[in-house]
Amino acid sequence: MSLTLRVLAPDQSVFDGSADEVILPSTTGQLGILPGHVSLLAALDVGVLRVRADGGWKSIALMGGFAEVDADDVTVLVNSAELGSSIDASSAESDLQAARNEVSKMEGQPASADKVKAQQSLDRARARVQAAKNQD
């Protein structure tokens, strides 16, 4: 018994296949999905979706969205996503360092749209690095 997982972004189908287990980065924490899971809708945060299939794990960097679980079908609708295997780890690390520098420059400043954007960039860069490094 397995799950059918579809990860869909506005411009592409990122993943469409079978999975033995899915771990979603929900806004309330990690959410594990196994075959036979109860139906649910969940808001997703920026983070890494993990897929166990064919005896190994795949990672997908998600940039927020929603997940629907219905019987053994999992549909993930996201703003943007990248397979970890398609992310250049060294480039992602450079982006992460640049985002950290930008956030640190804004330490102590009052809340602003620029500060929020810098934090969001840091979260996205962190997710990309984690997805690139967590390929089995």
UniProtKB/Swiss-Prot annotation:
| Cellular compartment(s) | Cellular thylakoid membrane
Per the record, the domain of life is Bacteria
Q: How does it sit in the membrane?
A: Peripheral membrane protein
Tell me which SUPFAM superfamilies the record gives: Epsilon subunit of F1F0-ATP synthase N-terminal domain (SSF51344)
Q: GO cellular-component terms in the record?
A: plasma membrane-derived thylakoid membrane; proton-transporting ATP synthase complex
Where would you say this protein principally sits, based on its record? Answer: membrane
- For the keyword Zinc, the answer is no
Q: Which UniProt keywords apply?
A: ATP synthesis, CF(1), Hydrogen ion transport, Ion transport, Membrane, Thylakoid, Transport
Which InterPro entries would you find in this protein's record?
ATP_synth_F1_dsu/esu, ATP_synth_F1_dsu/esu_N, ATP_synth_F1_esu_C, ATPsynth_dsu/esu_N
Q: Where is this region: Disordered?
A: 88-136
Q: Name one Pfam family in it.
A: ATP-synt_DE_N
Please name the Gene3D superfamilies in this protein's record. F0F1 ATP synthase delta/epsilon subunit, N-terminal, Helix hairpin bin
- CDD domains reported for this sequence: F1-ATPase_delta
Q: Which molecular function GO terms apply here?
A: ATP binding; proton-transporting ATP synthase activity, rotational mechanism
Subunit and partners:
F-type ATPases have 2 components, CF(1) - the catalytic core - and CF(0) - the membrane proton channel. CF(1) has five subunits: alpha(3), beta(3), gamma(1), delta(1), epsilon(1). CF(0) has three main subunits: a, b and c.
Q: What does this protein do?
A: Produces ATP from ADP in the presence of a proton gradient across the membrane.
Q: Which family does it belong to?
A: Belongs to the ATPase epsilon chain family.
Name listed for the protein in its UniProt record? ATP synthase epsilon chain
Per the UniProt record, the source organism is: Synechococcus sp. (strain WH7803)
Q: Which gene encodes it?
A: atpC
